[in-house]
Amino acid sequence: MGKYNLILSEYLSFIYNSQSAVQIPIYYSSNSELENRCIEFHSKCLENSKNGLSLKKLFAEYSDVIENATLLSILSYSYDKYNAVERKLVKYAKSKPLEADLTVNELDYENNKITSELFPTAEEYTDSLMDPAILTSLSSNLNAVMFWLEKHENDVAEKLKIYKRRLDLFTIVASTVNKYGVPRHNAKYRYEYEVMKDKPYYLVTWANSSIEMLMSVFSHEDYLIARELIVLSYSNRSTLAKLVSSPMSILVALVDINGTFITNEELELEFSNKYVRAIVPDQTFDELKQMLDNMRKAGLTDIPKMIQDWLVDCSIEKFPLMAKIYSWSFHVGFRKQKMLDAALDQLKTEYTEDVDDEMYREYTMLIRDEVVKMLEEPVKHDDHLLQDSELAGLLSMSSASNGESRQLKFGRKTIFSTKKNMHVMDDMANGRYTPGIIPPVNVNKPIPLGRRDVPGRRTRIIFILPYEYFIAQHAVVEKMLIYAKHTREYAEFYSQSNQLLSYGDVTRFLSNNSMVLYTDVSQWDSSQHNTQPFRKGIIMGLDMLANMTNDARVIQTLNLYKQTQINLMDSYVQIPDGNVIKKIQYGAVASGEKQTKAANSIANLALIKTVLSRISNKYSFATKIIRVDGDDNYAVLQFNTEVTKQMVQDVSNDVRETYARMNAKVKALVSTVGIEIAKRYIAGGKIFFRAGINLLNNEKRGQSTQWDQAAVLYSNYIVNRLRGFETDREFILTKIMQMTSVAITGSLRLFPSERVLTTNSTFKVFDSEDFIIEYGTTDDEVYIQRAFMSLSSQKSGIADEIAASSTFKNYVSRLSEQLLFSKNNIVSRGIALTEKAKLNSYAPISLEKRRAQISALLTMLQKPVTFKSSKITINDILRDIKPFFTVSEAHLSIQYQKFMPTLPDNVQYIIQCIGSRTYQIEDDGSKSAISRLISKYSVYRPSIEELYKVISLHENEIQLYLISLGIPKIDADTYVGSKIYSQDKYRILESYVYNLLSINYGCYQLFDFNSPDLEKLIRIPFKGKIPAVTFILHLYAKLEVINHAIKNGSWISLFCNYPKSEMIKLWKKMWNITSLRSPYTNANFFQD
């Protein structure tokens, strides 16, 4: 077993280093004789430790267990009072503590003052502005660093340099924290007033960020960047990240393109050796100089110097350092402002009458026309989704907050909850459910607010609207998104594309006679000037659409949608300010509606079109592409002459002047070679992503467990690593150890082993090898997987009680009745389960389940109990396949250029050998005929799991299933009797397997699985006609080959001789695969 278990036992002896501490390893085996020895070994260990005897003799006596069995967990005893952190910290606190400059930030509370100066009393205190919001503590983080330092103090050569760099930075953190004492956290990992009152308010979140940064230091440059950010972020809690990352928007315009990848007609990336010169007017250099001056004014020295040095020759070879600075800037932590300041930010923009009405008119008309274009077809054809919009809305209602806490009765149980789904049920039960009336959000019923915190930007507010708004908007927005899915302009929604496709789109048209205009419109989206024209454009579009149909229900859907827009034109918000709740009129657009993303995209597209139509009066150009992606839009303009400095400058100034005429405070830039938007940036013809995910601070608290957060931490580490920000893996593993350990009593703790945390079971947290998802096939691995499956889902008394109440039952049967035309148990049970799952977001239920889960886990980690299960996992399938493959050495040569310079070498190597893919593999079954047939007649959307179940039923059961969902009998008959049905079986199985194998996550999403270079390494003689079996054999082989290449940097070839007799057996097994949800899969999903 790997590195993890080794580090684990070293970590435990580091933490519990007193005489009274004992570590007892617990082993298990699938071999029953050995298993008995494991049990004996364990009980003797307990016996000896109770009597204070050494365990050394036992280790020798039971060497067979230690050598042949698998480590399950380590039990640690310690009667030590836990102030070890402070004692160890003193050793490192050797330098002068940092002193916060209390005048750096504009808002008083953003200065790092002593807590009692900001909050004189415990009543006034709030941790919301500095809450790390993660289920691990500062003391754990300090321990993890000190463990690493102690372990590496005898390193040599290059490793010694890394040690010294980190030691130096940790000295700063240790000295500062030590000056005030380590803040102790409470049971919920929060820092209370008593602990914080005599300490700087931002101490904890700053120390977490600093630890995250210093544990990501490898080179000397890393050290310089980290030191500067650590020192300055102690004082500057507001603008540091913004200052450091601002220059990037200009830097991307300075690098010549010498060879790049472009999207070809087949939507694949293809190398093009074109050369495009960066044409940069002096004005741009002046702006850059201004940015660097601002950085120096804020006390930065090394970082502006690095940028200045790079500017000498602006080479793409040295550009990764610029990318590094850009990524690092986000790791100073989240900027968390008070809600009042966040809201007022939008409202203090001056409202001027001096705007270009003609442009606004054009803008509104473009929005109107786009809305009409998107919805015209569904409206004219009286689409059933628009007819049954209310039901569709209910089925996809989330369990987020509805804005107010209510007292709800479920049977005999009375609970308080804010959750939408519970409010809907309660309203239905009490005759208060009126989806036809959209509640006003005016001064009488102001909107409660949520928040969104992001590093380097101001806090943004989010509307928490009543659920009626969701129901009214859901169906219409879904139709808009379907339109956007096949419209290239909407980069974010375009069908199954990933960011590589958008990259090739931009580079495609770059040449010496074109320029690209890129604009960050986030300020515009939330500005007051946008709100009237924006809502009016949508309303006008809806009015036009209402005249295209005679169907009363479609008209009603459109009218309700229109009503949400009318209500929101007169919106007030409620903001807690101290003890009072302030009501203010809020005239801007905020997130929180279902339409936010779609409507913003429409508006941003209309905006750039408006601007371009103005510019075209003065210049002659062809617009090659227009794209909008979230808060950004960009366009490539092709002129009929070669671009000159003067032209770039003129176009740039005219574009800015045009935006200014609409009073839009946006950042518009023009370049000939690159762009920078929130999601990605292109420089020198290569694509970069910001590696800015914080590891030790979180944006907000949810109801996830420590295990979930450990998995998210690992997942974040992987994403950052793929994007060029690497944190020490040993440190990440140490954090996982801390976060997955389970306390039994005050002095007893259980630490799961690597096998438990990496086997794909319901408890999986990380991969034993980065980027490689292993599916264990050895006896012990399958044994432990089975053991964990036996305790997968935990019951909750509260949830059962709610589900048994008439309120809940009536709601579920009401949904079923509206949806189904005849009895359909699969769907009814599915709805009931979905609704019951939504209850998990109610804290008491998730707590109850967590407790049950932990007690089951404790039993399991001390002695695994297996059960004979008929359930088959993907591991079983792969285990059956594996023996029939023979491996031989092979060779693939590098044949593609690099286009994503930040990738780790081993991942880069694979892309250079087999190529990349620009599309997401379909893994939800939505492309299958049955899925399309259902969505043609019903608002119900079956999951891939459900489709997988249904498609393997008998033909008459499939017919009944379809008919119950309202599909006409003739269509159902035709479907079952056709070839399409057998194609579907294969297609859905394929989707399901792709889904199970996480093929669209991690680094697998970058590889071209259909690469001919990969195919030629695999030889599988074609026997019998079972496409599903051939598919799984090929996919398994491809994953084996790729995993081997990631691990070893070399290629193997696989030959498979699969007996015909086994094929049918395998095929039958393939229809019974159980999918496993784990913290690990949730974290993958969470990345999405």
Curated annotation (Swiss-Prot):
Keyword Magnesium: yes
Signal peptide (residue range): none
Gene3D superfamilies: 1.10.357.80, 1.20.120.1390, 3.30.230.140, 3.30.70.2480, Viral RNA-directed RNA polymerase, 4-helical domain
Locations listed in the record: Virion
Any one GO molecular-function label of the UniProt entry: RNA-directed RNA polymerase activity
GO cellular component, one term: virion component
Cofactor field: Mg(2+)
EC number in record: 2.7.7.48
Keywords: Magnesium, Nucleotide-binding, Nucleotidyltransferase, RNA-binding, RNA-directed RNA polymerase, Transferase, Viral RNA replication, Virion
Top-level lineage group: Viruses
All copies of domain RdRp catalytic, residue ranges: 501-687
Example GO biological process: DNA-templated transcription
Catalyzed reaction equations: RNA(n) + a ribonucleoside 5'-triphosphate = RNA(n+1) + diphosphate
Cross-referenced Pfam families: RdRP_4, Rotavirus_VP1
Entry annotated with the keyword Transferase: yes
Database matches in SUPFAM superfamilies: DNA/RNA polymerases (SSF56672)
InterPro entries per record: DNA/RNA_pol_sf (IPR043502), RNA-dir_pol_4-hel_dom (IPR042032), RNA-dir_pol_luteovirus (IPR001795), RNA-dir_pol_reovirus (IPR007097), Rotavirus_VP1_C (IPR022071)
Subunit structure as annotated in this protein's UniProt entry: Interacts with VP3 (Potential). Interacts with VP2; this interaction activates VP1. Interacts with NSP5; this interaction is probably necessary for the formation of functional virus factories. Interacts with NSP2; this interaction is weak.
Family: Belongs to the reoviridae RNA-directed RNA polymerase family.
Protein name, per record: RNA-directed RNA polymerase
